[in-house]
Amino acid sequence: MPVSFLSLASQPQIIDYPAIKEEIDSIKKVAAGDPVSEYRAVSLVLKQTVLKGREVIAEALTRRPHQGRIAALSYAYLTDQIIQLALYAMVGDDEKATDNLVILAVGGYGRGEMALHSDVDIAFLSRRSPRKAQKKLIESLISLLWDVGLRVSQSHRSLSDMVKMAKKDITIRTALLESRYLVGDKALFEEASTRFIQKVVAGSGRDFVAAKLLEWDERHLARGDSRYLVEPHLKEGKGGLRDLQSLFWIAKYLYLEKEARHTVLTSPILTDYALVKADLIAGHEAKRFRRCENFLWAVRCHLHILVKRPEERLNFDVQRSLAEKMGYRSKSGKSAVERFMHHYFLVTKMVGNLAALFIDALKVNHYLKPKSRRSGASKQIDGFPVIQGEIVLDDDFFFRHNPAALITLFAVAYRHRLDIHPLTLRQAGRDARLIDEALQNNPVCNAAFLTLFTLPYNPAPILKIMNNTGVLGRFIPDFGRIVAQMQFDMYHHYTVDEHAIRALDILWQIENNKLEDLYPLGSRLFKQLNARLVLYMALFLHDIAKGREGSHSALGAEIALRLCPRFGLTAAETKLVAWLVKNHLLMSHTAFQRDLADAKTITDFANAVKSPERLRLLYLLTVADISAVGPHIWNSWKNQLLTSLYEACSQCLLEGPTGHGAGRQQRIENRQNDVSEKLDWDNDLFHALVKRLPDDYWFSERTDVIAANMQQIIDTDSKGQSISVRGHEMPAYDATMISLYAIDHPGFFYRISGAIHATGGNILDARIHTTRDGMAMDNLLVQNSQGGMIKSGEHLNRMMQAIEDAATSHIRSSNKLAALRPPLFWRGKAFHVEPLVFIDNQASDRFTVIEVNAQDRPALLHDLGCALFNARLTISSAHIATYGERAVDVFYVSDLFSHKITNQNRLKAIEKRLLAAADAARISEK
C-alpha cells in the first residue's frame, strides 16, 4: 500500500492508487510474459496518470490560487504514488526484491514540497553493495520514471558511504536531513536514520549553522543583496523560498541534535513545528512562517504551470500573468501586477524579519557567538539601558509603558552611535501597533525623528532598521504606503521605500567625499549648501506619493507641506522641501530631453529654479535620485549633461536673463579663442572656417569637439573629398563619438541613424549642424548594444563604412533594420508603452520641439527620423533618453525654410505620422 504523509480531501482525484494497481495487474496478464509490450503499456498508463494528476492539482490551484502549500504537497504525493506503482509494476508484492534496499525521497521532494517541474530527488540506500538483480532493478526503475515524465535525479550509496559522505559534504548532509521513506526495507531506513543522527548530526550543530549561514550570505551576494529587486529570484533571492528552507534545515538539525532519540522516520515533516520545538521562534511567529511559505509556494506552482518549464525568476514577462492567475485586480491607482508584487515584497520582508529573529535566537542559544544580553555592567543613556555599546531592554513591556520610546529608541541609538540588540528590535516590531495618531503627532517623537536628518551621520542604516521593524511605516503612514511597493517597469530596480533609503545613503556618501570620483561637482556643491536638512528631507519624501492616482510629484509636495511642520521644520524649510519634491524630475528631464545649446532651454530652467541655492539642492537631489534607481543607471554621460545644465544655469542666474542674452556673442568669441589656441592655426585659415559655422554650433559642442571637427573639415576639403567619417572613443561618456562631414541633403539624419542601428549601435545624442555653405557637420554619441563604448577596431570600422555608404549613395537600411527584431524573450515584450507625442513651440525661440514617448525597440530613432523626413522637416538636434522599456526621443525641428511649424493642421499631421512610426514594427521609406 502507498505510504501517505499527507491528508488531502482530493487524494482519490489526484490518483486512484488501487485502480491503477489493478490496471497494472491486468496489463501483466494480457502481456503474458512479453516484457516489451508490458513495459510500453505500463509506462503509458503511468504517464497518463501523471498528466491527469497534474491537471487535477492545477485545477484545484486555479480554484484556490493561494493554497500553495497544498499544491506543493499534492505534487509530492502524486510522485510518491507513481514511484511506488512503478516499483510494483516491476516486482509486484515480492518484498525480497527490495531486501537490503530502501528508496528515499530526499531534498525538497523529501520535505514534501514540489512544483510542476521540480526535480525528483531520490536515493537508493543499501547495507552493502546490491546484488546484480537489484542493480538492474534500479536502472529499470529510473528509466521507467523518466519515460512517464518525472525529472529524476538519483544517487546510490551504502550505509557506511552515506555516513562518510554526509560528514564531508554539507550538501549531501542537507539532502539526507530531509530524507523520507518511500518504499523498501523499512528496518534499513530506521537504522540509517539512527546512524545519521548519532554519527553525523550529534555534536555538529554549531558547524552546520555556520556553514548554512555562510551559504545564505553567498547566495544573497550572488543574486543581488536586496529582497526588493523588481525581477526577484523566487527560490534563491533574498527573502525567497531558500531562505525559509534554510531556517527549517537549521531548526530541524538542531532539534534532532537536541532530541537524539527522534529519527528522521518519526518526524518526516517538521517545518514550523521544528522551529518552535528548537526554541528558535515563538508560536505566533511560526504562523507567519507558514503564511510566507504558503504564498511563495503558490507563486512557484503557478509559475511552473504558466511557463511550462522549471523557472524560478519572476521576470517582467510573467509577473502580469501571475497576478491574473492569483486573482489580483487593479485598484486605487495600482495595477494588478503592482498589487501582486507589492504582496510579494511584503512577504519577503516578513521572511527577512523572521530570519533576523531566528538568527538572534541562535545567538541566545549559543549556536552562534553571542553578544550576551545580560553580561557586563548596564548604564542608562537617555532612558535606555545600554550594555557594551548596545541598547538591551530588560522589560518585555517597556514600550507598552512608554510608547514614545518606539521612536526615541532609534534616535538615541543614532545620536550616541549605539547598536540595538536584536531582541529589542523584536519587541519594537511586535509593539509597533501601539503607534497611533496621538503618537504620530507627539512633539517629542517628531523631534527625535528629525535628529536622524540633522546630525552628521548616515541616516540610511537606522532608517532601514526602522523600516524593517515596521515602526517607520506606522509612524509615517504615508511612507507605510510605499513600503514594498514596486513599479512595473524595467527602469526601477528596487521598491519605492528601498529606493528612498538608498538615495539617502548615496547623498550622505557624496556629502562626505566618499564618491568624489563619481560625483566631483556634487562633492564641491555640498560645501556651499545652507539648507542641508531641507535636502535630506526632500530626498526622503520625493517619491512618497508613488502608487497614487495623479502626479506623484505634485501629490508628494502636498504631503511634504503636511508632514514637515509635524517633524519640526520651519515654514520656509517646509516650502522649500515641497518645491524640491514637486520639481524633483525637472533637472533630469531638462538635461536629458532638451537641447542645452538652446538659450531658451537655459533661461526657462533658470526661471523655474530662481536661485543658486535651489539649483544646488535640485542638482544634488537629482544625482542621488538617479543613482539610487539601480546599478549602472548613473553614468558619465548623465553626469556630463547634468553638469553642463548646472553650469549654464548658474551662469544665467549670475548674469540674469538680460545679461545672459547680451553675453551670448562674447561667449561665442571666448569659445572661438579657446579653439584657436588649441589648434594653433594661421589666423586667416581659422577665421575663414569660423565664418562657415553657424552661431549655435559654438554653444552646442565642447572646445575639444569643435577643434576635432574643424581639423576634420580642413583635412577633407584639402583632399578634395566630399565626405569624412571619423570615430573616437569617449571614455568619460562610456561611448564613442561619430563625427560626419558631408554634403547635406533631405533625410540625411534618418539614413545615418539607420546605418548606425543596422551595425549594432545605439545613439545617445545627436548634434546636427549645417554650415553656411550647405555641408553637414554632425556629431553623434553612440554606444554598442550592451550600453558600452564601441572601441576602435572591426566594429567601429564597419559602422563608419555603413554611415559613409548611407550618406553618399542614399542606401536605405530598411532591409537590415527589418532583421533587428527584439529577441524572442526580450524583456520589453512584457510591457506596453502607449505612444505619446508632445509638440512645444514655446521651449525654443527658433525651433519646434517635438517629444515622442514610446516603447523602446531597435531602430526606433530611425523610424521617427524617417517620419519627420516624410513630413518635410529638418532636424537640428536629437536627444535620446531611455528609462527601461520607455524611450523619450526629443527633436528640435524646423520646416525647409528654417521656420517653426505653427499651422495646426500640419502639427496634427506630424503627430499622426510620429504616432504611427512609434507604434509600428517597421515603417516604409517613401
UniProtKB/Swiss-Prot annotation:
GO terms for biological process: regulation of nitrogen utilization. Residues 1-379 are annotated as: Uridylyltransferase. Its EC number is 2.7.7.59, 3.1.4.-. GO terms for molecular function: [protein-PII] uridylyltransferase activity; phosphoric diester hydrolase activity. It comes from Zymomonas mobilis subsp. mobilis (strain ATCC 31821 / ZM4 / CP4). Residues 380-736 are annotated as: Uridylyl-removing. This is Bifunctional uridylyltransferase/uridylyl-removing enzyme. PANTHER family: BIFUNCTIONAL URIDYLYLTRANSFERASE/URIDYLYL-REMOVING ENZYME (PTHR47320), BIFUNCTIONAL URIDYLYLTRANSFERASE_URIDYLYL-REMOVING ENZYME (PTHR47320:SF1). SMART domains: HDc. The keyword Nucleotidyltransferase applies. HAMAP family: PII_uridylyl_transf. Its cofactor is Mg(2+). The lineage of its organism: Bacteria, Pseudomonadati, Pseudomonadota, Alphaproteobacteria, Sphingomonadales. Residues 737-814, 849-926 form the ACT domain.
